[in-house]
């Protein structure tokens, strides 16, 4: 355990108490409850903070009580003998009742040290529309796209984007609202899918910021973890990319993360034959690794990323060109590959989950120091 202490570069383990804020959604829907089940995460963080020798507390927050809880933590800053540090896992869009950006704004307002995304990065990546605009402005390659603001607003989609097209909610996490029927080939399929998405999923609003249609990129998919801040490349870390190798039985146009198969719900889609995995992880071809890292970093910078992110990339199998699908502020964190690709990235990078958590906490202190210096100069 002592060997892990050098990881804590910005503080000592006796000076802080970490509050892990986890989003709690109060719902009676089993499918959505499963998506927000953090029981496995609690065990992981118990192990992490035991190894780091840091006092910590797991604290669920809802959209209704997050302010009271953050007020309580802020009082510790003034009166307790340890500095509170908030390890923020809240990733909601707040449209459907899950806490998210309001938590970040209040943490900033209270002057608390917190991990992960700041308000700008959170906001620009919550909806795919401002994120895609940021990619376009920075000339980061991404799939051609078109916003759909209304279910009747679907003229000239195929003329603009080609065939096939994939339709996604502009605001969505964990592949919610994305399935194999989202890949459409003609106007009839497009209209049917758009109507369905505007109707929502089990009461979940999928069209709060409209939909986005993209050219479907046929080819391999990669994912990259970045920790740090866009304006501090020296201290940032771009992890080894991994490829999601989808099951060989799947047609090319079903080789993507659909909600049904990702979360093993199987309402409309079938599991893999012989109980095989939906996908496995592998290292990309060595010749692609630096290029994948570069385009991921460019996307992170385009969105002024901070804290950490997971960037998803696809490669056109015909041209070999790489395209950014998205960057995920507040992406799920776990070393368990059944829950998130971060586990596979850590495995291929030979980095423990404890090391990653320490990196993320250190980044919060680095950002605090930079912010304090900026205020002094101003």
Where are these regions (language model features)?
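Anion (oxyanion) recognition and catalysis
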Residues: 50, 108, 136, 159, ...
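C-terminal active-site "lid" helix and adjoining low-complexity regulatory extension at the edge
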Residues: 283-287, 306, 315-378
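Hydrophobic beta-strand scaffold residues
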Residues: 56, 113-114, 142, 165
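Phosphate-binding site of ATP-dependent enzymes
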Residues: 189-273, 291-294, 322-323
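Active-site nucleotide/adenylate-binding loops and adjacent lid/helix of ATP-dependent enzymes
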Residues: 2, 14-21, 76-80, 123-212, ...
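ATP-binding N-terminal substructure of ATP-dependent carboxylate-amine bond-forming enzymes
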Residues: 1-113, 120, 126, 130, ...
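A long amphipathic alpha-helix within ATP-dependent nucleotide-binding catalytic cores
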Residues: 196-206, 260-317, 372-375
């Amino acid at each position: 355990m002592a060997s892990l202490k050098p990881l804590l570069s910005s503080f000592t383990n006796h000076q802080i108490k970490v509050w892990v804020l986890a989003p709690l959604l109060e719902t009676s829907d089993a499918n959505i409850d499963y998506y927000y089940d953090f029981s496995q995460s609690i065990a992981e963080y118990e192990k992490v903070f035991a190894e780091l020798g840091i006092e910590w507390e797991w604290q669920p927050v809802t959209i209704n009580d997050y302010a009271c809880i953050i007020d309580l933590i802020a009082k510790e800053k003034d009166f307790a003998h340890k500095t509170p540090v908030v390890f923020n896992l809240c990733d909601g869009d707040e449209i459907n009742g899950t806490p998210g950006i309001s938590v970040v704004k209040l943490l900033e307002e209270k002057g608390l040290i917190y991990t992960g995304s700041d308000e700008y990065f959170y906001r620009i990546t919550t909806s795919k529309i401002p994120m895609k605009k940021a990619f376009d402005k920075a000339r980061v390659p991404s799939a051609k796209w078109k916003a759909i603001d209304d279910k009747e607003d679907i003229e000239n989609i195929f003329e603009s984007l080609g065939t096939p097209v994939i339709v996604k909610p502009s605001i969505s996490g964990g592949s919610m609202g994305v399935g194999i029927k989202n890949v459409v080939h003609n106007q009839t399929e497009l209209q049917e899918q758009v109507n369905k998405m505007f109707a929502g999923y089990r009461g979940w609003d999928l069209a709060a910021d409209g939909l986005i249609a993209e050219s479907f990129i046929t080819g391999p998919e990669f994912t990259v973890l970045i920790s740090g801040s866009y304006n501090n490349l020296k201290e940032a870390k771009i992890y080894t990319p991994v490829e999601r190798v989808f099951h060989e039985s799947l047609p090319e146009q079903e080789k993507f993360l659909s909600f049904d198969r990702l979360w093993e719900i199987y309402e409309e889609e079938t599991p893999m034959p012989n109980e095989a995995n939906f996908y496995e992880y592998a290292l990309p071809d060595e010749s692609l690794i630096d290029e994948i890292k570069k385009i991921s970093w460019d996307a992170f910078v385009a969105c002024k990323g901070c804290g950490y992110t997971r960037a998803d990339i696809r490669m056109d199998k015909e041209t070999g060109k790489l395209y950014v699908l998205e960057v995920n502020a507040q992406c799920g964190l776990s070393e368990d590959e059944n829950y998130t690709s971060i586990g596979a990235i850590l495995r291929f990078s030979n980095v423990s989950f404890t090391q990653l958590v320490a990196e993320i906490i250190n980044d919060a202190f680095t950002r605090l120091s930079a912010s304090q210096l900026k205020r002094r100069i101003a």
